[in-house]
């Protein structure tokens, strides 16, 4: 897999990230083997959140790390906090408590990156700044990012925190293409023209913030997978034809479509299937032409003015 710098930082990681939201039912030995398979495929970054499996995902990963002391230095781990039962919490106390819990479950003494999982409209920016200062000074967190933040939320946060925000996780896929559609359909009355994220794609490029695309195979908001879904015959026909020409799968083409964008995004995949993991990682070696990229985009039902 190709490696890339995250934001303007010294953190270098694979352009495909393994999301760990679904590992809670794996055994420690199964997860250990799976991590090895991911590393063999070229993946060096693993994505967690304190709510995944109600903490069990981090606990299992931590058991693997504890049984293999030299593994930690070979990989990058990021995790997220802010989502609680029925509300969001970016208070200083919750951020600090969350990180301590994350580190305890992962059985490590640092995170390569902490991301604020969802924007908390009640957050006191001075508190977030103090929490970041403590975490950075103590060595518990090396880099910081956000998730699902719009441009002005990042701008406001960055006005208070000293540490650069180097990543922003956003839902993005062929069928959930708001990030690009509002720009493509600018100055029209098309349904996709209204911008819902503060032009976050352009903002992140200007500020050298890496967008980490989550749910690359989903349509809607957790409505399901579009790959081989009979609801979407046209996009699957185009994906299938291009996949056959390139000698890879439809899923690999769907990821390659995201990686083709010059914003230099990372893609977070959440599979726990070894064969599918290796298959998707072939995306790193696929180069879509401009014509192919737009053909896939149009096949997904997105209009060009």
Which residues make up each language-model segment?
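A structural motif
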Residues: 43, 108-111, 141, 165
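Short, acidic/polar
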Residues: 26-38, 90-106, 152-155
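Beta/alpha (TIM)-barrel catalytic core signal, keyed to glycine-rich beta->alpha loops juxtaposed to Asp/Glu
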Residues: 123-305
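Active-site groove signature of glycoside hydrolases
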Residues: 103-124
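Hydrophobic faces of well-ordered beta-strands that scaffold small-molecule active sites
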Residues: 14-18, 46-48, 75-79, 114-116, ...
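N-terminal binding-site loop/beta-alpha segment at the start of enzyme catalytic domains
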Residues: 1-75, 137, 218-220
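Active-site mouth loops of central-metabolism enzymes
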Residues: 19-29, 81-93, 122
């Amino acid at each position: 897999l190709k490696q890339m710098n995250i934001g303007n930082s010294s953190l270098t990681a694979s352009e495909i990230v393994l999301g760990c939201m679904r590992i809670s039912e794996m055994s420690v030995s199964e997860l250990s083997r799976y991590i090895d398979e991911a590393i063999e495929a070229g993946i060096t970054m693993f994505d967690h959140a304190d709510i995944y499996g109600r903490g069990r995902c981090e606990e299992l990963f931590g058991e693997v790390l504890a049984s293999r002391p030299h593994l930690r230095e070979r990989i990058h781990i990021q995790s997220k906090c802010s989502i609680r039962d029925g509300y969001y919490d970016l208070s200083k106390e919750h951020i600090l408590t969350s990180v301590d819990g994350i580190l305890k479950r992962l059985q490590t003494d640092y995170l390569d990156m902490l991301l604020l999982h969802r924007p908390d409209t009640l957050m006191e920016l001075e508190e977030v700044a103090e929490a970041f200062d403590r975490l950075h000074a103590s060595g518990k967190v090396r880099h910081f990012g956000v998730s699902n933040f719009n441009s002005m939320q990042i701008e406001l946060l960055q006005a208070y925190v000293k540490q650069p925000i180097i990543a922003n996780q956003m839902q993005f896929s062929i069928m959930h293409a708001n990030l690009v559609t509002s720009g493509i359909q600018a100055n029209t009355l098309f349904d996709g023209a209204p911008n819902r994220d503060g032009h976050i794609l352009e903002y992140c490029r200007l500020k050298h913030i890496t967008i980490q695309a989550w749910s690359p195979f989903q349509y809607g908001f957790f409505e399901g997978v579009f790959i081989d879904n009979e609801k979407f015959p046209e996009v699957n026909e185009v994906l299938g034809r291009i996949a056959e020409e390139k000698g890879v799968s439809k899923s690999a083409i769907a990821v390659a479509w995201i990686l083709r964008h010059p914003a230099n995004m990372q893609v977070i995949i959440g599979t726990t299937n070894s064969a599918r993991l290796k298959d998707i990682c072939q995306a790193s070696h696929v180069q879509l032409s401009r014509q192919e990229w737009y053909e896939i985009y149009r096949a997904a039902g997105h209009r060009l003015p």
